[in-house]
Amino acid sequence: MTSASQILVWGLLAASGAQAQNYGGGSSRSDDAFSYVQPKNTTILGAYGHSPAVYPSPNTTGSGGWETALAQAQDFVAQLTLEEKANMVTGQPGPCVGNIIAIPRLNFSGLCLQDGPLAIRVTDMASVFSAGVTAAASWDRKILYERGYAMGQEFKAKGAHVALGPVAGPLGRSAYSGRNWEGFAADPYLTGVAMEETIQGYQDAGVQACPKHFIGNEQETMRNPTFNDSAPLGTVIQEAVSSNIDDRTMHELYLWPFANAVHAKAASIMCSYQRINGSYGCENSKTLNGLLKGELGFQGYVMSDWGATHSGVAGIKSGQDMDMPGGLGAYGQTFINRSFFGGNVTAAVNNGTLEESRIDDMILRIMTPYFWLGQDQDYPTVDPSTADYNTFSPRNTWYQDFNLTGERSRDVRGNHAALIRKQAAEATVLLKNKNNALPLKAPKTLAVFGNDASDITNGPYNDATYEYGTLAAGGGSGTGRFTYLVSPLTAINARAQKDNTSLVQFWLNNTQIATSDVQADLLRVPTPPTACLVFVKTWAEEGADREHLRLDYNGTEVVEAVAAACNNTIVVTHSSGINELPFANHPNVTAILAAHFPGQESGNSIVDVLYGDVNPSGRLPYTIARNGSDYNAPPTTAVTTSGREDWQSWFDEKLEIDYRYFDAHNIPVLYEFGFGLSYTTFNISDIYATRVVDSITSAPEDRAIQPGGNPELWETIYNVTVSVTNTGDVEGATVPQLYVTFPDSTPEGTPPKQLRGFDKVSLQPGESTKVIFELMRRDLSYWDTVSQQWLIPEGDFTIRVGFSSRNLKEVTTITPVSE
């Protein structure tokens, strides 16, 4: 048993380790960085600038299939002392990134919480998978599930009970957000599907999923408050940025994918650093009690992001259930040896400030998914190597003995290398392929350019950008520790040997390439190589928003210098997401591939695509504009005033993000949302829609809330069928996409079209197949702010199906509710 006074000690130690990781946000920016200064006279919050109070925090009922596990959790809670209850909701320093200590007398071994969304970050002998944005670019439900399941297997085998992912916040409001790559797509529907498939994969493997960051977490700059460190507790100078989001936008954009997460029975959800409509994410009763636990019927527990707890009693009453990592404070503040939770929970119950029943519900929410997933039955112990790599809470900060007696450095990778290679290849997006430059056909000579082509030079773990070495993951808590990383140059050399390619030249110094006459100074041969491969990259990380949308390390200049000398220049980008591509129409740039962050099999996966072993079938999960200045919804990077509440981010674009914005304003783009080429061709035909229910009303029947909300919203009401044919000469996969245009009766501000269905189909030459899209009630509904419910508008819906958001071949109409 740990006393209240003991609980107060370790908060300092855990939090100090967190501060050292420098994930705080609001870091300094270079002189030429993109800047958006908040306009003056916006510091007085508007109609949606104040988050309304919603109390009390709803109790869990175990609905959705957790009833038996809830009964087990109730029996467990009934045996706890008050001090043990405080420990159950408060993190401590230990071997994992987050730790809930064991209670041996109840045979509870504690909880190990581990980063992150593409790998187990603090361990060895584990795989590094492709990033979320890469997985989303596959537009493949099977890949999304398999990736989640394989990661879940590795987390479990290392003894982690909770995987801190996947990510739906940021959604991708801004092209500049530093963490877009951790998430999936700049669209709520595609992100929602990716969340659901990934969570089901994690949890089918026996690991709790923790979707994050709830909600409106769309920028890194000023995500935490600034403090006067000289004050006893660190007086706040300026509060964290507030994401100010209107009710309809909240529901139709930012809450949408979290509804999928809850529908998938996610065990936990992480609340975010920043404020939402004036209140911090982890003490916002409207978002936690009202939206998440109330409207969506979430049955699991809400944990704080690391250092995102700003209060004890207020946060608990507002719906927060677990404090991580357990110490008092937030990033940038001098931590002291107390916890907002911990001993303060005990004190608050004893003095009547908190009802013990609320603490009981917090623990029921924590333990119900634990029992539901069978984590009380022969669960693997924590790998001791985890502690060796965990700089978040080094061993000398631990207050408890974690009895790490299991096998050290256990290899949990299994056969996942082949899976990672396949997934990354199939997610690669072919943006340009002039004159069928790809696939390569045993070229006689090759030249490889760019610092992204080579082996990494800074070791297996990189939390900051690096000049030399291929980029396979971003930085921050969402990164991974490579046991190996196959570079493009290594894989190309291996393939060249196999093909008897006579010469593979390479230049890795971007400055040298960009400032040279490539033909005269570098190639020094009378005729250019058969193909020139240029590898360029763009870093992004937690804690800082992107400063520009250009390629890093003079990448554009490198491409242009090579293209000036080589009439078959093939460009591969390893990027966190959106890039400006001013060379896209250069006549000598014959092919462009967006490979995003592919994980440890980077080189092998791109060579599979370059040589045609895999026909690329990735599609863009965002829009690539003609110019960086064409994007809307910038992050707030600075303010001109010094008031405590002055950091505001006004989501006044409302529903118009990414393709919705470009479509609404008829802005030409370079490559549209959903775009991607193949080495073969496809056709779509014969669209028809079928109503599958007899009667459809505008409002859903008022039914008991289940995980995901009103179950009526998840019922299919229409099927839309099309025929897809491979009209080319080689096998390939394509992604038919369905977009809905709402009737004119829908309120103003509705986007011209919205993604509401997709499927990936693989076909042999000449083969055809039927694709059926199931449209649920929620897919045809908008959020009505007056009645506070989802409504299907009266009138005709236009249904379009095609191969991208701007290549829609087949059209039909449906009328669910007549005028």
From Swiss-Prot:
Residues 1-20 form the signal peptide. GO terms for cellular component: extracellular region. SMART domains: Fn3_like (SM01217). One of its GO terms (molecular function) is beta-glucosidase activity. The active site is at residue 305. InterPro entries: Cellulose_deg_GH3, Fn3-like, Glyco_hydro_3_C, Glyco_hydro_3_C_sf, Glyco_hydro_3_N, Glyco_hydro_3_N_sf, Glycoside_hydrolase_SF, Ig-like_fold. Glycans are attached at residues 41, 59, 107, 228, 277, 337, 344, 351, 403, 500, 509, 554, 567, 588, 627, 683, 719. It catalyses: Hydrolysis of terminal, non-reducing beta-D-glucosyl residues with release of beta-D-glucose. Its EC number is 3.2.1.21. Keywords: Carbohydrate metabolism, Cellulose degradation, Glycoprotein, Glycosidase, Hydrolase, Polysaccharide degradation, Secreted, Signal. One of its GO terms (biological process) is cellulose catabolic process. Its main location: secreted. The keyword Cytoplasm does not apply. It is found in: Secreted. Pathway: Glycan metabolism; cellulose degradation. It is an enzyme of class 3 (hydrolase). PANTHER family: BETA-GLUCOSIDASE, BETA-GLUCOSIDASE G-RELATED. Belongs to the glycosyl hydrolase 3 family. Beta-glucosidases are one of a number of cellulolytic enzymes involved in the degradation of cellulosic biomass. Catalyzes the last step releasing glucose from the inhibitory cellobiose. This is Probable beta-glucosidase G. It comes from Emericella nidulans (strain FGSC A4 / ATCC 38163 / CBS 112.46 / NRRL 194 / M139) (Aspergillus nidulans). The gene is bglG.
